[in-house]
Amino acid sequence: MLSCDGTFLLLHTLKSGSKDGIIQFEKLEFDKDVIFMKLENAELKNIERIVAISKAAFDSDIDVGASEPGGPPDYDSIAWHIQMKNEGHLLQAVIDGEIVGGAILFLEKDGEILYIGRIFIDPIHHRKGYGLSLMKMVEAYYSGVKTIKLDTPLWNVRTNAFYTKLGYCEVRRDQEFAYYQKELKSVFEVNGCLAKLS
């Protein structure tokens, strides 16, 4: 949720019986079933940690179809991540003061399209709902865009299923990648704050 003071916080409940992926805007009592994740511009002092998470996350793809450890171009490059930070594309995902992941995002066509270059969560936090929370935060943070686009390798069964679960539709594929997109609903302003129509 984006408050009028610029604070951005998503409360995503994982309690059984709740609707998966629903953003809870009311205050929730803190317990082990609630994720409090903050999405913010990456800080230079955190680049080494972010790169270590990126490397670990993409290297873990060997468990879901990759032929060997590795990732997209520059996934393990400190210099490239610094460049992405300096250009405003690199965000860090933080829970309880700990960086747990990141996202590299690009606005296109005068802010109408968001291209998700990559998202990544530290493998020690896989299967905890952090990736789902990160994607929901990206969608809420960029709620003014009309379309979100991304791509993922065909061999990666984990990410293809994940994006489909989140409502992304495959629009095409080539020999290496599946290309997905999602159309977002309208946004309106209430008391100077953005709110998404449901």
Label the model's feature ranges.
Residues M37-A52:
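A short beta-loop-alpha structural element at the N-terminal edge
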Residues A79-Q92:
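A short helix-loop-beta-strand connector motif used in the catalytic cores of GNAT acetyltransferases and
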Residues H125, G129-M137:
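Conserved acetyl-CoA pyrophosphate-binding loop and the N-cap/start of the following alpha-helix
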Residues H126, K149-N160, E176-F177:
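Conserved beta-strand-loop-alpha-helix junction that forms the acyl-donor binding cleft
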Residues M135, Y142-L154:
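Conserved GNAT acetyl-CoA-binding A-motif
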